[in-house]
Amino acid sequence: MYLVSLLSSCCLLVLLGTLPARAAHEDPVEKVIEGFSRGLSNAEREVGKALEGINNGITQAGREVEKIFGELSNMGSQAGKNVEHGLDKVAHDINNGIGHAGKEAEKFAHGVNHAAGQVGKETNKIIHHGVSQGGSEAGKFGQGSHHAFGQGGNVANKLGHETHHAFGQGGNVAHKLGHETHHAFGQGGNVADKLGHGGNVADKLGHGTHHAFGQGGNVADKLGHETHHAFGQGGNVADKLGHGTHHAFGQGGNVADKLGHETHHAFGQGGNVAEKLGHETHHAFGQGGNMADKFGQGAHHAFGQGGNMADKFGQGAHHAFGQGGNMADKFGQGAHHAFGQGGNMADKFGQGAHHAFGQGGNMADKFGQGAHHAFGQGGNMADKFGQGAHHAFGQGRDMAETFDQGAHHAFGQGGREGGRLVQGAGQGLSHAAKEAQQFGHGHGHGYYAAGQTWQEGDKVIHPGVSQAGEEMEQFGQGVRHTIKQAEKEAEKVAHGVQNGVNQAQKEAEKVAHGVQNGVNQAQKEAEKVAHGVQNGVNQAQKEAEKVAHGVQTGVNQAGKETQRVGQGVQTGFNQGQKEAEKVAHGVQTGVNQAGKETQKAGQGVNYAAGQAEKEAEKLGQGVHHAAGQEMNRLQQDVHNGVNQPSKEANQLLNGSHQGQGGYGGQHGGAATTTVVSGASVNKPFINFPALWRSIAATMP
């Protein structure tokens, strides 16, 4: 009996031990949890794959956008290179035109200098030749005139002073001529300076240039008048020279000595005027006539302030083309001012290069910040892509969060059901344990107790099992309900995930469509930008052509004005040459008149000298005649005086010869003469006192 009860107890204990193990081994809640875990893992994997695909799509779209931006940057760089190349060509053509104009101006200046030097040489030759000729004549005149004339005033001094004053007046006029011409061309230069500073070049170029060269024309007019006045003054001087010279030679005086010096001084002063004429003629062609000397520095001053192109070409070459044409000076900064306000491409190319292409085209400056403004309002994709993508997936995230919450809620519901199951099982087991305790307490009552216990055990087991079965059925129903609820929630979650994925796909499609639209819009904007760049380049080319045409027109206008100035200078130069020829002719006439007067004076001197010589010859002839007569008389008297003693001596000799005989006479004739001995004759052979008395008696 005891053994049976022991075996039954062991079986009961084994039964009670195996039931929780089987229940624990075959727990459906764990299966449900494992199923949910597997479903969530699969859902997470799918969502991760979807996110990875979206991320790959976004990365690919970013690469495409970067490619588009790179192409746009290359297009902008190519357009900038084309614009710079075109502007370099324009600047090169302008440099060539300016260099050619400078060469022509240099040739012109060289020709003017050569012509002026040639005229100066010819003038110097004429004046020096005339002065030398007049000086030679005056020197000849001065040699005999000082002895021929003894009266007169300081006419030659006055003549030299008046001539010097006259040529000094002419020299002052010539000096004023140089200054007035310099002032005239300086005034034209100031106008050209104003021309360079004024922006309205096209308007002011015609008017200002006309004004400048009109002022130069007035100067040329003044040049003609002042030259005429100067050479007219010189003509008056030449007239006075003729009259004064005639008056000088009419008056006489210290003309001979001073005329050679003062006339040479007067004409030397005129020679200085001629030398000044050579210099001042070169100076009279304007300050711009220093082109040969200053050509490398300021060769274009003759063409106006705007012509400082050669000196300032690297800095402000385009001042002649207007305020907008500061291309060379501001090329790196604001080269496109000439092409319009919108054309600040060079200076602002890295910052705001697209201002010329429209307000929406601030891509260069704002490219890294708001590059997509050009692609539309919806194109804030780059900045907002992370946010917008998260917003697009935020709905899915809300779904995922809702899924987590719903799953947690579903599992919470299941947990509650499980908790209720455990509580129900615990209550059943607690009731069974109480019954077992009661069974343990009453196991010593014997069979009754055992039977009672069995009955009680049956009562306990059957109600407990029934209760447990009911609880298990309720648990199974709860589990089924929970599983169904979880399935519904899972379906909702899957549906939500599907909706989220679909929504994400739709958002991704919208994003891709937006990216596509943005790319298309960007392509359209890029095409617009390229078209705008092309239009800007074409406009720049048109403006450059206009600038080149304006430059060509300005150069042609400057060439025409230069030709006009050259013609005016040539006319003034020819007029000056004519006036110089008139002066030289007047000087030559004065010199010839002076020469004629000198020749007349010389002829008068020669006539007087010849007359005096004739008188001297007459005097000499008279003296010679008188002396000859007296000499003849003297010779006759001497001859007579000599002949008389000779006769007397002959008589004496003859008498001695007759008285002594031949031999003794010969002896006495040879040895007893008065001259030889002076002892045998009373009278001498020659009576010298008587001879001199007779000679003195014959002298008148």
From Swiss-Prot:
Tissue-by-tissue expression: Detected in epidermis, in suprabasal keratinocytes. Detected in suprabasal layers of embryonic epidermis and in stratified layers of embryonic tongue and palate. Detected in adult stomach.
Region (Disordered): 133-158, 183-258, 283-391, 641-669
Protein name per Swiss-Prot or TrEMBL: Suprabasin
Keywords recorded for this protein, A-Z: Coiled coil, Secreted, Signal
Cellular compartments annotated: Secreted
Keyword Signal: yes
Signal peptide boundaries: 1-23
Biased composition (Gly residues): 658-668
A Pfam family: SBSN_GxHH_rpt
Induction pattern: Up-regulated in differentiating keratinocytes.
Cellular component aspect of the GO annotation: cytoplasm; extracellular region
Keyword Zinc-finger: no
